[in-house]
A protein has these predicted regions:
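Extended basic (Lys/Arg/His-rich) segments that typically form rRNA-contacting surfaces
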Residues: 1-214
Length: 214
């Protein structure tokens, strides 16, 4: 498994590919990221790298984290994530990880936090059909009956009901890389990714291969 990169969603736009087809793309400011910690089989029993992205003010950094950054001679970072890696990854603490790890046409997975929608009903949250819209109907957008019989005499857990929607971790798999702009530290991915503009993202090489079309 190869490590990925951390970034920030800038927004969406459209570009033409080499065939003249208009493609919707998401623009991501990816890296450069600093390797803050290296975990090894000998010490932690697995191989991984801890990456930091986006400089933060020292006054807004916890004292414990200040020591962590000072140990590796790095400025404080806002966004820190860990990537599992193969043993043959030859990276060291303090090295920079840039968009050059990716190439056009490569498939990637993107992990982010979805937009928060607040408290929503079942029609919007779970796409329920809703009740009748006629004059005699008294429940247009309600969930309907949720009761059980004498047994079990209760409501099953995880029943779909109104509640908080969004603001959860989402993984979008197998998005193709359209362009890699090394000088600007920009990745262009075809399609949409979770979160609002300015939200942090994790971009990693795709784990699952897309199914072949028959």
């Amino acid at each position: 498994m190869s490590i990925g990169i951390l970034g920030k969603k800038l927004g969406m736009t459209q570009i033409y590919d080499e065939k003249g087809v208009l493609q919707p793309v998401t623009v991501i400011a990816a890296g450069p990221c600093t390797i803050l910690q290296k975990k090894t089989e000998e010490k932690e029993k697995y191989t991984a790298y801890q990456l930091g992205f986006d400089d933060a003010k020292e006054k807004n950094t916890a004292n414990a984290m200040k020591g962590h950054f000072k140990k590796v001679k790095s400025s404080p970072k806002r966004f820190i994530r860990e990537f599992r890696a193969n043993k043959d990854e030859n990276l060291n603490v303090g090295d920079a990880v840039t968009v050059t790890r990716f190439a056009p046409g490569q498939m990637v997975d993107v992990i982010g936090i979805s937009k928060g929608k607040g408290f929503q009903g079942v029609v919007r949250r779970y796409r329920f059909a809703g009740g009748g819209a006629a004059h005699g109907s008294k429940s247009h957008r309600r969930a309907g009956a949720i009761g059980m019989r004498a047994w079990p005499g209760r409501i099953w857990k995880n029943a779909r009901m109104p509640g908080h929607m969004g603001d959860v971790k989402i993984t979008i798999q197998n998005l193709p890389v359209v362009q890699v702009r090394e000088s600007e530290n920009i990745l262009l991915l075809r399609g949409s990714v979770p979160g609002s503009n300015g939200s942090y993202l994790v971009v990693r090489p795709a784990i699952k291969k897309p199914a072949l079309k028959k």
